[in-house]
Swiss-Prot record:
SUPFAM superfamilies linked to this entry: HAD-like, Ribosomal protein S5 domain 2-like
Gene name in the database record: hisB
Protein name: Histidine biosynthesis bifunctional protein HisB
Pathway recorded for this protein: Amino-acid biosynthesis; L-histidine biosynthesis; L-histidine from 5-phospho-alpha-D-ribose 1-diphosphate: step 6/9; Amino-acid biosynthesis; L-histidine biosynthesis; L-histidine from 5-phospho-alpha-D-ribose 1-diphosphate: step 8/9
Main location: cytoplasm
Biological process (GO), any one: L-histidine biosynthetic process
PANTHER family: IMIDAZOLEGLYCEROL-PHOSPHATE DEHYDRATASE, IMIDAZOLEGLYCEROL-PHOSPHATE DEHYDRATASE HIS7
Active site: 9 (nucleophile), 11 (proton donor)
Binding locations of Zn(2+): 92, 94, 100, 102
Record's subcellular location: Cytoplasm
EC numbers for this chain: 3.1.3.15, 4.2.1.19
Gene Ontology MF term list: histidinol-phosphatase activity; imidazoleglycerol-phosphate dehydratase activity; metal ion binding
Cofactor entry: Mg(2+); Zn(2+)
Nucleus found in the keyword field: no
Amino acid sequence: MTQPTLFIDRDGTLIDEPKTDFQIDSLEKLKLERNVIPALLKLKDHYRFVMVSNQDGLGTDSFPQENFDKPHNAMLEIFRSQGIEFDAILICPHKPEDNCDCRKPKIKLLKKYIDKKLFDPAHSFVIGDRATDVQLAENLGIQALQYHPEKLDWDLIVEKLLPKTTACKRPPRYAEVVRTTKETDIKVQVWLDETGVNQISTGVGFFDHMLDQIATHGGFRMNVQCKGDLWIDEHHTVEDTALALGTALKQALGDKRGIQRFGFVLPMDECKAECTMDLSGRPYFKFKAKFKREKVGDFSTEMTEHFFQSIAYTLMATLHLKTQGDNDHHKIESLFKVFGRTLRQCIKVEGNELPSSKGVL
């Protein structure tokens, strides 16, 4: 039967992967990833679980089968004891040089699920810590959640996979903005009272990742689709996306009744990023950050300030941002994350009063 399915990697995702030899070949090496059991318990009523793992040289002298079986079976017993079962456990025992057809990201291991159409492509995901897991998802035509114990842990994965709606008795705070110019064609959708998987595609990979940070740390869900004149450069794509996103956020907020309005976060991450925000209806922007590099990936560092300035003016917000550190990638990422965290405070609904003595925001 077709149903939502999670194809889950084992080493580095369900259990810790030792960086010394990348083998869990004894009970002493068996260690569950943090909060994996509570997460799977929350997900099990909504998804089928399928474990998919590459185990290099399994059954050879370099990795005897019995050395694998003891910790593997112990792990399964722990999961079973907590009510967690896997529909299938699919393992490729080959090494990369064997050039087999079943090693991830190839899809032969999942032939049954593909041929019998057992998974719902629109609501199925690959969860894993490696680039091969992301590629597996692409080969299956589904989405990937690249697990990371700090950036995308099991708690955040649950948030993305189990959208939550507001308990307040008010219409959902949703907005859709379409912005078309000679340079760009953009569609932005925001759901301020939901979390879930964000669909973001601008053609600028690093920028996509940064936009996802805003929604993830902002505690809301958004879709951003942009087709821009990237054969020139990414300027119009970044600027126009910011304008559309700011407009969508402003529209979704509606009359702003019950929101906190103010937010601040400091410091955040190793880069000491700081943000203060007021959804005042009066745009103002102040930015302090210096970058050594011209580009991070395919993203011009100078566009960081321009992005936030554009979003502040269409969101009609007072926004102060600054960061300092050594790594330009980390500094830019810290600004997007701290913006999301601060926005999360501002848009949180706590009642029905308008947070202004003027009676309007």
